Swiss-Prot record:
It comes from Salmonella choleraesuis (strain SC-B67). Pathway: Glycolipid biosynthesis; lipid IV(A) biosynthesis; lipid IV(A) from (3R)-3-hydroxytetradecanoyl-[acyl-carrier-protein] and UDP-N-acetyl-alpha-D-glucosamine: step 6/6. The keyword Lipid biosynthesis applies. Pfam families: LpxK. Keywords: ATP-binding, Kinase, Lipid A biosynthesis, Lipid biosynthesis, Lipid metabolism, Nucleotide-binding, Transferase. The gene is lpxK. This is Tetraacyldisaccharide 4'-kinase. The lineage of its organism: Bacteria, Pseudomonadati, Pseudomonadota, Gammaproteobacteria, Enterobacterales. It comes from the Bacteria. It is an enzyme of class 2 (transferase). ATP binds at T55, A56, G57, G58, N59, G60, K61, T62. GO terms for molecular function: ATP binding; tetraacyldisaccharide 4'-kinase activity.
C-alpha cells in the first residue's frame, strides 16, 4: 500500500498532504537554522563524508558505504564509520563495535559494514558522539557516516546521495504522502549522486549491484545460487523486490518470496517456519548477520557489491583522498 501511495498510483496520498506540508516545513526550518548559523554543527577534526538518501526506503546505500570504505582502504586511508544503528538497542551509547557485538545491540547494517570491511564502526543516536568514540580509540584519517544526510548537527565535507534508479522520487512529496525526506532540488547542493539501477541522468554516477556466489551460513561454502534447488527467498531490506529480481536474474527461481520489514528482528522459530522439508532458504547478507547464530544447514545468503561505472567514481575518490591530511 505504501509503495502505491508513494508512487502516485493510489489517490490516498492526497489525504496525507497536510502532514507532508508540516514535515516539509519542519525539516526545511531545521536545515535553514544551520545554514543561517542559528544552530551550530559540530565539526570533527578529520574530514566527514555523508552517504545518505533523499527518500525513505532502501536505495542501496549500505553497498555504497562498503564500496567507499574498501576503495579508500586500498589507497592506504584509515577509515572509520558511524551510524545511527537502526534496529539495534545498546545498553549505552556511543557503542564501538567489536567482533562480539550483536545486531540486537548495533543494528544489522553497522554489523554488516564492520564484518565486511574491518573498519572501526561506532553507533549512536547523536552521530557526533559516535565520531568522538572512534577518534578516541582509533587513529582514523576520515569518517564515513552511513545515512545522516539530514543530521545537520554533524558538519560534513562531502555529501553523497544514493538514488533508486527505478523508483527515483516517486510522487515527489515529503513524508508521509510521498517518500521524500527533502525535496529533489537538494541534489543541486550535494557532491555526488549515485543511481542504483535504472538509467542515470546527466551528472549522475551509474551503479549496479553485482551478486557474488551464494554463501552457506553454517559452513561458509560457496556456490552459484542457480545451483540451489527449491528456494525460499527472504529479504528484510528497504525494497525486497530488488533482491527477488536479482535472484531471478541469476537463474534462481524461488518457489516462495518472503518480504520482511527493513531492520526487522528475526526470531529463530519464525525463520525456521519459512522453510519446509527439502527447501533451501536464500536471504540477503543483511539478514544473514542476524541469522548466523541460529542458522540451519540449508540456509544461504547472496552477497552483492556496488559496481560504479564511468570516470566520475575515480574523480570522487581522488577528491575525498585529497581531503586527508
Amino acid at each position: 500500500m505504501i509503495a502505491r501511495i508513494w508512487s502516485g498510483e493510489s489517490p490516498l496520498w492526497r489525504l496525507l498532504l497536510p502532514l507532508s506540508w508540516l514535515y516539509g516545513l519542519v525539516s526545511g526550518a531545521i536545515r535553514l537554522s544551520y545554514k543561517l548559523g542559528f544552530k551550530r554543527a559540530w565539526r570533527a577534526p578529520v574530514p566527514v563524508v555523508v552517504v545518505g538518501n533523499l527518500t525513505a526506503g532502501g536505495n542501496g546505500k549500505t553497498p555504497v558505504v562498503i564500496w567507499l570504505v574498501e576503495k579508500l582502504q586500498q589507497r592506504g586511508v584509515r577509515v572509520g564509520v558511524v551510524s545511527r544503528g537502526y534496529g539495534g538497542k545498546a545498553a549505552a551509547y556511543p557503542l564501538l563495535l567489536t567482533p562480539e557485538t550483536t545486531t540486537a545491540e548495533a543494528g544489522d547494517e553497522p554489523v554488516l559494514i564492520y564484518q565486511r570491511t574491518g573498519a572501526p564502526v561506532a553507533v549512536a543516536p547523536e552521530r557526533a558522539a559516535a565520531v568522538k568514540a572512534i577518534l578516541a580509540a582509533h587513529n582514523v584519517q576520515i569518517i564515513i557516516t552511513d545515512d545522516g544526510l539530514q543530521h545537520y548537527r554533524l558538519a560534513r565535507d562531502i555529501e553523497i546521495v544514493v538514488i533508486d534508479g527505478v523508483r527515483r522520487f516517486g510522487n515527489g512529496w515529503w513524508l508521509p504522502a510521498g517518500p521524500m525526506r527533502e525535496r529533489a532540488s537538494r541534489l543541486k547542493t550535494v557532491d555526488a549522486a549515485i543511481v542504483n539501477g535504472g538509467v542515470a541522468r546527466v551528472g549522475e554516477i551509474p551503479m549496479q549491484l553485482a551478486p557474488g556466489l551464494a554463501v552457506n551460513l553454517r559452513t561458509g561454502a560457496r556456490c552459484d545460487v542457480a545451483q540451489l534447488s527449491n528456494i525460499v527467498a527472504m529479504a528484510g531490506i528497504g525494497h525486497p523486490p530488488r533482491f527477488f529480481a536479482t535472484l531471478e536474474a541469476c537463474g534462481a527461481h524461488p518457489q516462495k518470496c518472503v518480504p520482511l520489514a527493513d531492520h526487522q528482528t528475526l526470531a529463530p522459530a519464525d525463520v525456521q517456519a519459512l522453510v519446509g522439508e527439502g527447501q533451501t532458504l536464500v536471504m540477503t547478507e543483511k539478514d544473514a548477520v542476524k541469522c548466523r547464530a541460529f542458522a540451519e544447514d540449508n540456509w544461504w545468503f547472496l552477497p552483492v557489491d556496488a559496481r560504479l561505472s564511468g570516470e566520475q567514481p575515480d574523480k570522487l575518490l581522488e577528491h575525498i583522498t585529497s581531503l586527508v591530511r
